Amino acid sequence: MLRIGNGYDVHKLVEGRKLMLGGVEVPHTKGVLGHSDGDVLLHAITDAIIGALGLGDIGLHFPDNDENLKDIDSAILLKKINNIMKEKNYKIVNLDSIIVMQKPKLRPYIDSIRDNIAKILEINSELINVKAKTEEKLGFTGDETGVKSYCVVLLEKKKC
């Protein structure tokens, strides 16, 4: 059986915070404001896997008012959902994601981001694609006040 999930996340950019994308700290003058570390890419991936499993969304599993999750590394959240996916006997067939922000240019970081996601999910990096886009200076990503990410994931039930 195959299952598809879509994920999405958005956060405000502010000074004085780290910019975490795919578990990699990207040098920038602004970082992400969020209850956790605000890693929009890992949140979108987590949300996509949750959706593919039919288990709601990321907010259901990790509410933004839970003080135990304050400033938590988003990789921990993704690992928890990855474990649930494995317990349900699913594996990732393909993961395609997009990070949308005006600056900084992310091309130099894409390979390390992809490799880190593969490490977190314990899969081959060839199953993962990460793209970076701008919105041509339009909207909140264009005026550099926010960042967003999308992800689609294809899961396959393992043969017993």
Swiss-Prot record:
Its cofactor is a divalent metal cation. Pathway: Isoprenoid biosynthesis; isopentenyl diphosphate biosynthesis via DXP pathway; isopentenyl diphosphate from 1-deoxy-D-xylulose 5-phosphate: step 4/6. The keyword Lyase applies. Binds 1 divalent metal cation per subunit. GO terms for biological process: isopentenyl diphosphate biosynthetic process, methylerythritol 4-phosphate pathway; terpenoid biosynthetic process. The record marks 35, 134 as: Transition state stabilizer. A divalent metal cation binds at residues 9, 11, 43. It is an enzyme of class 4 (lyase). GO terms for molecular function: 2-C-methyl-D-erythritol 2,4-cyclodiphosphate synthase activity; metal ion binding. It catalyses: 4-CDP-2-C-methyl-D-erythritol 2-phosphate = 2-C-methyl-D-erythritol 2,4-cyclic diphosphate + CMP. InterPro entries: MECDP_synthase, MECDP_synthase_CS, MECDP_synthase_sf. Transmembrane segments: none annotated. Its EC number is 4.6.1.12. 4-CDP-2-C-methyl-D-erythritol 2-phosphate binds at residues 9-11, 35-36, 57-59, 62-66, 140. Pfam families: YgbB (PF02542). Keywords: Isoprene biosynthesis, Lyase, Metal-binding. Belongs to the IspF family. Homotrimer. PANTHER family: 2-C-METHYL-D-ERYTHRITOL 2,4-CYCLODIPHOSPHATE SYNTHASE, CHLOROPLASTIC. Involved in the biosynthesis of isopentenyl diphosphate (IPP) and dimethylallyl diphosphate (DMAPP), two major building blocks of isoprenoid compounds. Catalyzes the conversion of 4-diphosphocytidyl-2-C-methyl-D-erythritol 2-phosphate (CDP-ME2P) to 2-C-methyl-D-erythritol 2,4-cyclodiphosphate (ME-CPP) with a corresponding release of cytidine 5-monophosphate (CMP). This is 2-C-methyl-D-erythritol 2,4-cyclodiphosphate synthase. It comes from Fusobacterium nucleatum subsp. nucleatum (strain ATCC 25586 / DSM 15643 / BCRC 10681 / CIP 101130 / JCM 8532 / KCTC 2640 / LMG 13131 / VPI 4355). The lineage of its organism: Bacteria, Fusobacteriati, Fusobacteriota, Fusobacteriia, Fusobacteriales. The gene is ispF.
